[in-house]
Amino acid sequence: SSLFKQVQNWRARVSTADFAVTNGYVYLKQPAAIVDPDLLMRTFEFVAQNGAPLAHATELHVAQVVEELAARPVKFEWWRHLSSILIRPHAALALRIMQQLGMLNVIVPEFHSIDALALRDLYHQYTVDEHTFKAIETVHKLQEAEAEWEVRFREVYEELEEPSLLFLALLMHDVGKGAPADKPHVDASLEIALERLEALGLSARETEDVYWLIEQHLEMSAVLRRDIFDAATVRAFTKRVGTPERLKMLLLLTYADIKAVNKDALTPWKAENLWQLYISAANDLNRSVDDDRFHADTDPELLRNIRLLAPQLGKRLKRFLEGMPQRYLSLHSAEEIAAHVELASKVNGN
């Protein structure tokens, strides 16, 4: 039948040198080969990409390697593989399997403290670990968005430079909820994140962005309880955010965090307010950059850096840059600026 052929074609398309999909389950072509973290993590990447769970036989092989890794931790490029899992469409399925087989605890040992942890209130529908996976799933499901308000969030997601950082922040934003009750969960999550981000092998800038997202993950929700049409409220929020990229990630983190609490948590009214706050903050960030001008006396460092690359420009460089919007300086390299100075000199005939 044509349906049988479609299934056969899908199996052939998704199968690789290492993995085969049979009856909708992932099998290892060479089970004995799964002895190192590399193939182990690629197994979860395969699940995250194709949405097929592991066959029972595969689970047994994986569990054995995970057990050995838990007993004897190894130095490994965990972030390279974890980031690849997080950005794939079925990341949440892969993460659930990783948790079930103990792999998530190998990478983030503190995750075991939120395993099946229930919050005793009427608001949270899911355990903390499942809320985390749902939040990651929520962002990925934006790819299927049809409603106009959801499409706007999807477009922001598609603009992200490094979506893996957003997903890592979501993975770790509530990990501190398993800490003693006398410590605020954000503080506990930050302590854990600081240690884990370094162990995962993130760069200093990546660590800073993920840490900031975890630290501020309740901020947008807090601002929504104020007057979001008040310019001073928006300006104070914008100052804390700092960059358009962080604003985009915080918007999506907040959207996913609220939506993954329970099926009715993100009402259309709340989603609209969240979007309005984002637009106001984005406009404020753009205005701030346009209003901010370069002055040689207050920023001599930049002048020196460009002069090192193009000493022939002399005083023309200072004249050209004086009063330029800071946005221009952030968009162009020193080489491009030097070329623009030369072009302006030709146009002006000097």
Report residues per predicted region.
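Short coil/turn segments at secondary-structure boundaries
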Residues: 1-3, 54-62, 74-79, 93-102, ...
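Regulatory modules associated with amino-acid/nitrogen control
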Residues: 1-25, 233-350
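Flexible, glycine/threonine-enriched loop-and-boundary segments that flank and lead into catalytic domains
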Residues: 117-121, 144-159, 194-195, 231-237, ...
